[in-house]
Amino acid sequence: MARYTGPRSRISRRFGEPVMGDSKALQKKNYAPGMHGRNKKRKQSEYSIQLKEKQKAKYTYGVLERQFAKTFDTAARKQGITGENLLKMLEARLDNTVYRLGIASSRRAARQLVIHKHIVVNGDVVNIPSYQLKPGDQLGVREKSKSIEAITDSLSTQSAKKFTWLEWDQSSMLGKFVTYPQREEIPENIQEQLIVELYSK
């Protein structure tokens, strides 16, 4: 499965919520896309409900199938609750944290900033979006990238978004991944237990 690059509104309408960021389309057309979207009321099987939840998580965090399965496998081998481990690992991705800090306006934009080497971790450029941050890691905008309009615009409009597991210093454009978030701190509407049940089949 290739990375989805189509309209975000179409994905939001499929799940009935702004999975890939704010979507004005949901306000006008809060039903599934397609010719029969408005009248789609078939009873869903347990499997389809579980699969849909996994797809929602993949679209939310911008992760492809193979990488998602690998992340789940790692989460299952860790101590603790598998579903919560999965979400914590998705939250600890570099691209997601760049988005959470407000450096980028969306996870898709954050991914591009990472790929194009605008982000540093502990002083070194890291261009791997899936890079797993560890508690104590410092990350921020590369010195020569601090004047990029997309970054400054995003920081000016999203700086109010604060997450307890992150720290951010606006003047230096440097942040810190303090710790892994607790489940109740993660705002995404994902029922991770359904994903665990799907992989347990």
Curated annotation (Swiss-Prot):
The organism of origin for this protein: Cytophaga hutchinsonii (strain ATCC 33406 / DSM 1761 / CIP 103989 / NBRC 15051 / NCIMB 9469 / D465)
Name listed for the protein in its UniProt record: Small ribosomal subunit protein uS4
One GO cellular component term noted in the UniProt record for this chain: small ribosomal subunit
Gene that this polypeptide is encoded by: rpsD
UniProt GO BP: ribosomal small subunit biogenesis; translation
PANTHER family documented for this protein: 30S 40S RIBOSOMAL PROTEIN, SMALL RIBOSOMAL SUBUNIT PROTEIN US4M
Signal peptide stretch: none
NCBIfam families for this protein: PRK05327.1, rpsD_bact
Family, similarity comment: Belongs to the universal ribosomal protein uS4 family.
Domain of life, per lineage: Bacteria
Cysteines joined through disulfide linkages: none
Role summary: One of the primary rRNA binding proteins, it binds directly to 16S rRNA where it nucleates assembly of the body of the 30S subunit. With S5 and S12 plays an important role in translational accuracy.
